[in-house]
């Protein structure tokens, strides 16, 4: 993740970053656990040029520009053992998105700090939400982290990034002992805290 993110710069195509990421994984003995995704600016997550070379709605061309907010999400598996990692960067490090990037990292850390066996999931989400709100952002409520198991990227348990309450059907129960999780809090400058186009 660091190798690729440190080499991203203005003028690169979205597709070239994705190809570079997947080549690096294979060159080092792994395989992509899912198509590498590169989501730019108001695209919150899960966009990959592996599915299309047609720009998404509102994007003229898929070339990185100085000041773009880029979310790079890479999954690796080695003999079925999966790692799911993401990083958010600003192209050119102009400081336009520093607070938002910091808030996402701090929300992740706050969630991890809460994740002890027996902790209700809604308390994990509440910790992430509080960090986002204190920093002036909204958590994205319909994107979440997830459990990882061998050969299973989404293993049934979701990790909330907002205070969903103790009775939310998607986040009932408590943090189990021995689980492996991708903790993925998303935040937004928008008011709804929801991703509107999930296609």
Predicted regions and their residues:
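Active-site neighborhoods and metal-handling regions in enzymes and metal-associated proteins
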Residues: 1-199
């Amino acid at each position: 993740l660091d190798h690729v993110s440190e080499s991203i710069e203005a003028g690169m195509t979205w597709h070239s970053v994705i190809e570079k990421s997947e080549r690096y994984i294979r060159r080092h003995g792994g395989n992509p656990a899912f198509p590498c995704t590169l989501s730019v600016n108001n695209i919150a997550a899960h966009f990959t040029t592996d599915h299309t070379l047609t720009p998404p709605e509102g994007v003229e061309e898929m070339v990185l520009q100085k000041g773009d907010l880029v979310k790079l999400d890479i999954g690796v598996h080695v003999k079925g053992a999966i790692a799911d990692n993401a990083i958010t960067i600003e192209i050119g490090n102009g400081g336009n998105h520093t607070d938002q990037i910091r808030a996402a990292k701090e929300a992740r850390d706050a969630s991890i700090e809460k994740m002890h066996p027996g902790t209700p999931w809604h308390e994990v989400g509440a910790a992430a939400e509080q960090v986002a709100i204190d920093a002036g952002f909204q958590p994205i409520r319909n994107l979440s982290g997830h459990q990882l198991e061998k050969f299973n990227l989404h293993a049934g348990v979701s990790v909330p990034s907002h205070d969903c309450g103790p009775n939310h059907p998607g986040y009932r129960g408590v943090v189990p002992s021995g689980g492996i999780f991708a903790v993925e809090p998303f935040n937004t400058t928008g008011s709804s805290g929801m991703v509107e186009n999930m296609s």
